[in-house]
């Protein structure tokens, strides 16, 4: 599913942070979907890959970031649930990914499978799927190799290392300011109905750390998420 083509009309500005959203007109319909799974996030890059990188290396980075965004969005939803602001059950992200692996669905494959099929695999009523599009200048990351980039992405979400998170300007490029957009949707696992949709558009300074960039976007998505008590 390409959630950019679902008829959501948006006027987005090129400065700051803008968002537009759609919620199913029958709120009770949304609330009848009690269990939700957050899917790996579809990543779309419009910049150039660093010189010398293979297509496989680029794909590995995309999938690593997909899981990083998924983990962050899931965490933001759990925060809201812990504060009594989310009236729904969110499946643990580890369980979501384990179930996908067990049936042979990889990160990239999950981006395009129908919501109904994914919901059946995961045993949930609805799935939250997101598409992130951004320009990446990764030339400063090339010398570190794909393993270094992937390690940093996972390291920043390890609670045991929160005190050691530092800025990695080489991860996204030095002194670059570009735009990032995120399209999020909650989709029925029964008939594919769009229950909720939001588009967030921001101007990002890529000298910020990876976790700041990722969590800034997912925090905005979580604030717009339905099921608020």
Regions inferred by a protein language model and the residue ranges of each:
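Hydrophobic alpha-helical segments, principally membrane-spanning helices and signal/leader peptides
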Residues: 1, 25, 108-110, 116, ...
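Sec-dependent bacterial lipoprotein signal peptides
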Residues: 1-17
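C-terminal/domain-edge helix-coil "capping" segments
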Residues: 17-48, 121, 134-229
């Amino acid at each position: 599913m390409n959630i950019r083509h679902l008829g959501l009309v948006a006027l987005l500005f090129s400065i700051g942070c803008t968002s537009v959203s759609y919620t199913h007109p029958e709120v009770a319909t949304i609330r009848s979907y009690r269990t939700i799974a957050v899917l790996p996030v579809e990543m779309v890059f419009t910049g150039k890959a660093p010189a010398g990188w293979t297509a496989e290396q680029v794909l590995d980075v995309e999938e690593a970031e997909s899981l990083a965004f998924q983990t962050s969005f899931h965490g933001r939803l759990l925060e809201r649930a812990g504060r009594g602001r989310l009236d729904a059950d969110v499946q643990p992200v580890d369980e979501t990914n384990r179930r996908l692996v067990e049936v042979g669905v990889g990160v990239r494959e999950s981006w395009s499978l129908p919501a109904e099929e994914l919901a059946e695999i995961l045993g949930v009523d609805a799935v939250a799927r997101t598409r992130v599009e951004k320009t990446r200048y990764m030339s400063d990351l090339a010398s570190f190799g794909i393993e270094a980039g992937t390690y940093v992405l996972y390291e920043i979400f390890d609670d045991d290392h929160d005190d050691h998170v530092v800025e990695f300007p080489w991860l996204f490029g030095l002194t670059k300011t570009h735009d990032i957009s995120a399209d999020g949707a909650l989709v029925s696992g029964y008939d594919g109905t769009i229950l909720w949709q939001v588009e967030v558009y921001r101007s990002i300074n890529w000298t910020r750390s990876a976790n700041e960039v990722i969590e800034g976007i997912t925090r905005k998505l979580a604030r717009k998420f339905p099921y608020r008590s």
